[in-house]
C-alpha cells in the first residue's frame, strides 16, 4: 500500500481524492500497488466529507510521517506552497503538483532539491490541465530540436473570445457570462490580462529549450482591449482572434517569447480550438508539427493529470524524473525587435494614403463608420509603434505566422 497526502483540499485537491477513490482498482493495476489518500492538509474542516477524519493542519505531520511517500500539492500560489513542497522534498517524498505559479517561479530550485534527495518533482498538470504535454517534452521528444511552441493556454479567455466571435458580444458582456458559468474568477485579472498563459508558456519553453525561462521576461498583453468591432473585421477576413502564448528558438541561442491576442486564418492548426478547450502546437526540426489538444482546466481533467504523476512516482519510486534544465537563465530577446504583420484599425476615410505608409497588403471594410482596417507588411515592433504615432489608430492585433 502506498500512502499519499494532499496539500490543499479545494477544487483540485478534492478532485484528486475523488479520482483516487473512484478509480482505485485501475490505478492499483497501473501502479503495481494500491494508492491510498492518507490525509489532507487544510485549515478548514470538512464535516460529512470522505476525508473528514483525515484532515491535518500541521505540515510536520506529513513531512515526519515515514508511511507517506508521495505528496500532492494543489494549494495554488507560492505561499505557503513553496515552503511546504520544499520541506516534503527534503524529507525524501516525491511531490506532484498542479501549481503553475509555483513551477514558474521556483521550478529549477525545486528540481535540484528533488534530485539531491533522490525523489521526483512532477508537474504534468501545471500547464495543460488534463493535456499530457510535460512528459512528452521531457521524455518523448528527445531526438529532435524543438524550434517553436505555440498554444492556446487559457480556457477562460478562449471561451470569451469564442463567444465574442460567434455571438457578437462585447467584452464586458462575455466576461459576465464567463463568471456566471464559473469559467472566470470574480477577479479575472490572471486570465484576461494574460498572466496565466505567461506562466504556462514560460514552463513549456523551459522544458522545450532546456533552460529556465523566467515568466517575468515574457512580454504579455491580455484580451481586455479586444472589442466586437475587432471581430467584425475578423469575420470579413475569414479569421478568428485567439490569445496565443508563443516562444521560438533563435539562431543566437536566445528565444523570442510573447503572450498576446493574434488573428489567425483557417489554415492555422489552432483555428478550430474553441470554447474552454486548450491546444499546444510543438514544432521540431525533423518531426514537423505535433499538436496536443484537450481540456486545459477543470476539476477532474486536472486531477487526472496529477494522479498520472502519482502513479508514475509509485511505479518507479527509485527513478527520479528530473526535467533537463541547464544552469542559468534563458535569454529572452526584446519583443520590440520582433517582426510581425499587423491588423490595424484607423479612424478616418483616407485609407489609401495610410495604407501606403504601412505598406498595407489589404484594406478592410467592415461597414463601421469613419474607420477602416489594414493588413500591414512586416515591421518590427519598434518600427510599427513609430508609424502608429502618426495616425489615429483604434486598435492593433498581430497576425500569427
Model-derived regions: residue spans:
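Rossmann-fold NAD(P)-binding glycine/threonine-rich loop
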Residues: 81-87, 91, 100-138
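Structural motif
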Residues: 7, 73-75, 98, 105, ...
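Rossmann-like NAD(P)H-binding beta-loop-alpha module
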Residues: 68, 115-196, 203
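A conserved regulatory-domain signal marking ACT and ACT-like small-molecule sensing domains
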Residues: 310-401
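Substrate-binding/catalytic subdomain of NAD(P)-dependent oxidoreductase enzymes
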Residues: 175-272, 277-279
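Catalytic, metal-anchored helix/loop core of enzyme active sites in primary metabolism
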Residues: 146-150, 158-161, 165, 177, ...
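N-terminal glycine-/serine-/threonine-rich beta1-alpha1-beta2 phosphate-ribose binding loop
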Residues: 1-91
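A short hydrophobic/small-residue beta-strand
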Residues: 94-96
Amino acid at each position: 500500500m502506498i500512502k499519499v497526502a494532499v496539500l490543499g483540499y479545494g477544487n483540485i485537491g478534492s478532485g484528486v481524492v475523488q479520482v483516487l477513490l473512484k478509480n482505485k482498482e485501475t490505478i492499483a493495476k497501473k501502479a503495481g500497488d494500491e494508492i491510498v489518500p492518507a490525509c489532507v492538509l487544510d485549515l478548514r474542516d470538512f464535516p460529512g466529507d470522505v476525508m473528514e477524519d483525515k484532515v491535518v493542519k500541521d505540515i510536520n505531520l506529513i513531512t515526519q510521517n515515514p508511511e507517506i511517500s508521495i505528496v500532492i500539492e494543489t494549494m495554488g500560489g507560492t505561499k505557503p506552497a513553496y515552503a511546504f513542497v520544499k520541506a516534503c522534498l527534503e524529507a525524501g517524498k516525491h511531490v506532484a503538483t498542479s501549481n503553475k505559479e509555483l513551477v514558474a517561479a521556483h521550478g529549477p530550485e525545486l528540481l535540484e532539491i528533488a534530485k539531491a534527495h533522490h525523489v521526483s518533482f512532477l508537474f504534468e498538470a501545471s500547464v495543460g490541465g488534463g493535456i499530457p504535454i510535460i512528459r512528452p517534452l521531457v521524455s518523448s521528444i528527445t531526438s529532435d530540436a524543438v524550434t517553436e511552441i505555440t498554444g492556446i493556454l487559457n480556457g477562460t479567455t478562449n471561451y470569451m473570445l469564442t463567444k465574442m466571435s460567434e455571438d457578437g458580444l462585447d467584452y464586458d458582456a462575455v466576461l459576465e457570462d464567463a463568471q456566471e458559468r464559473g469559467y472566470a474568477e470574480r477577479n479575472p485579472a490572471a486570465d484576461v490580462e494574460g498572466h496565466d498563459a505567461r506562466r504556462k508558456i514560460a514552463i513549456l519553453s523551459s522544458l522545450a529549450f532546456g533552460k529556465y525561462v523566467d515568466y517575468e521576461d515574457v512580454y504579455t498583453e491580455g484580451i481586455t482591449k479586444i472589442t466586437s468591432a475587432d471581430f467584425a473585421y475578423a469575420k470579413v477576413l475569414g479569421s478568428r482572434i485567439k490569445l496565443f502564448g508563443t516562444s521560438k528558438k533563435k539562431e543566437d541561442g536566445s528565444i523570442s517569447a510573447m503572450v498576446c491576442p493574434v488573428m489567425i486564418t483557417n489554415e492555422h492548426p489552432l483555428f478550430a480550438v474553441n470554447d474552454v478547450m486548450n491546444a499546444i502546437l510543438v514544432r521540431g526540426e525533423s518531426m514537423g508539427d505535433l499538436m496536443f489538444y484537450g481540456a486545459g482546466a477543470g476539476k477532474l481533467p486536472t486531477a487526472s493529470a496529477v494522479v498520472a504523476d502519482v502513479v508514475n512516482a509509485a511505479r518507479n519510486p527509485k527513478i527520479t524524473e528530473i526535467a533537463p534544465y541547464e544552469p542559468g537563465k534563458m535569454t529572452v530577446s526584446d519583443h520590440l525587435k520582433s517582426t510581425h504583420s499587423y491588423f490595424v484599425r484607423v479612424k478616418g476615410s483616407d485609407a489609401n494614403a495610410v495604407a501606403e505608409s504601412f505598406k498595407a497588403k489589404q484594406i478592410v471594410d467592415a461597414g463601421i463608420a469613419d474607420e477602416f482596417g489594414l493588413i500591414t507588411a512586416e515591421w518590427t515592433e519598434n518600427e510599427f509603434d513609430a508609424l502608429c504615432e502618426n495616425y489615429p489608430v483604434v486598435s492593433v492585433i498581430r497576425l500569427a505566422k
